[in-house]
Amino acid sequence: TTVYDAEGSKVDFDGSLRIIV
């Protein structure tokens, strides 16, 4: 799942709940 944080940076959430910014 890809979302964007408040600053517009892409944040990818994988199945292990790690966050890749």
Swiss-Prot record:
GO terms for biological process: monoatomic ion transport. GO terms for cellular component: cell outer membrane; pore complex. It is found in: Cell outer membrane. Transmembrane segments: none annotated. Keywords: Cell outer membrane, Ion transport, Membrane, Porin, Transmembrane, Transmembrane beta strand, Transport. GO terms for molecular function: porin activity. Its main location: membrane. Monomer. This is Major outer membrane protein P44. It comes from Mannheimia haemolytica (Pasteurella haemolytica).
